[in-house]
Amino acid sequence: MILVTTTPSVDGYTITNYQGIVFGEVVSGVNMFKDLGAGLRNMFGGRSQGYEEELMRARNEAIAEMQRRAEAMGAHAVVGVDIDYEVLGADNGMLMVTASGTAVQISRRA
């Protein structure tokens, strides 16, 4: 399992090698029924559970993709992770989530 952290280091470990920058990207379409529900909540207030679930799913997939790519590079961890969100498409019907960080090899401190 590849460790993932937003910090520049992993507590209790020493970074022994920097493998390079690694990304995981997911582009997801938004369902029209979720759009309808979200539009009503925008007018009347409240949270859009459909959008929140889609956002969480896309974020988890982007992190998992980043972990797979880091593992393919021979890394043990990804440090300095940042997650970005972007709305795409003429009708803003697509969501892009990007996870990025530095793939590193680590060893436990003595």
Curated annotation (Swiss-Prot):
Where do the TM regions start and end?
none
Which SUPFAM superfamilies does this chain map to?
YbjQ-like
Q: Indicate the family of this protein.
A: Belongs to the UPF0145 family.
Highest taxon, organism lineage: Bacteria
Pfam families per UniProt = YbjQ_1
HAMAP family (UniProt xref): UPF0145
Organism from which the protein derives: Bifidobacterium longum subsp. infantis (strain ATCC 15697 / DSM 20088 / JCM 1222 / NCTC 11817 / S12)
Name this protein carries in UniProt: UPF0145 protein Blon_0093/BLIJ_0092
